[in-house]
């Protein structure tokens, strides 16, 4: 009995289970004084995006372009954070600083990095929700459906064309399910984990979108 318990405790968590742990302690603080910035912790957001990269790595080289884009945006925010970790542990302070400097909408701004990371998280959450409800559907169909509502409205023709190419490289259901933990977990457990993650992530995304709107960064587009 003890051995079985030890083996269960030793069992490696999936990326989704790790994300649940990260986001379950995520707290957004809204100040009473409206002149102060809402406090949205930066590190858990970056940790979650890093977990997305880990899943993409498991899927293989077909996701290399998306992986690189996410990684570059994470690095951009981390670099800014390191200039004053006490102040910029709050992502709203980063947006506030860039707005004051007039750089928030520049190509290499943290504002743009946060916008696209948020869209990526929204896409990921949407895809997982669809997968939870329709595990028998083809991954290509689920990815395209989710893309149309989360990313396409902000993509220009170049980005949309690139997506169509990537869509042909989407892995099959089995490969993707194994990448997010189905190899060691039952589908019922995986579905429960997905639903838990979605319930945690949805209100967080809502708060981030609200802050992006405050700083005029909710309608950015790529080429």
UniProtKB/Swiss-Prot annotation:
Q: Which domain of life is it from?
A: Eukaryota
Tell me if Transmembrane helix is a UniProt keyword of this record.
no
Q: Does the keyword Endoplasmic reticulum apply?
A: no
One MF term in the entry's GO annotations:
lipid transfer activity
Coiled-coil annotated spans: none
Q: Which UniProt keywords apply?
A: Lipid transport, Transport
Record InterPro entries: GLTP_sf, Glycolipid_transfer_prot_dom
Binding residues for a ganglioside GM3 (d18:1(4E)): 69, 73, 116, 155
One GO cellular-component annotation of the UniProt record comes to: cytoplasm
Would you identify the family this protein belongs to, as annotated?
A: Belongs to the GLTP family.
Function in brief: Transfers glycolipids in vitro.
What PANTHER family does the record point to? Answer: GLYCOLIPID TRANSFER PROTEIN 2, GLYCOLIPID TRANSFER PROTEIN-RELATED
In Swiss-Prot or TrEMBL terms, this protein is called Glycolipid transfer protein 2
Record organism: Arabidopsis thaliana (Mouse-ear cress)
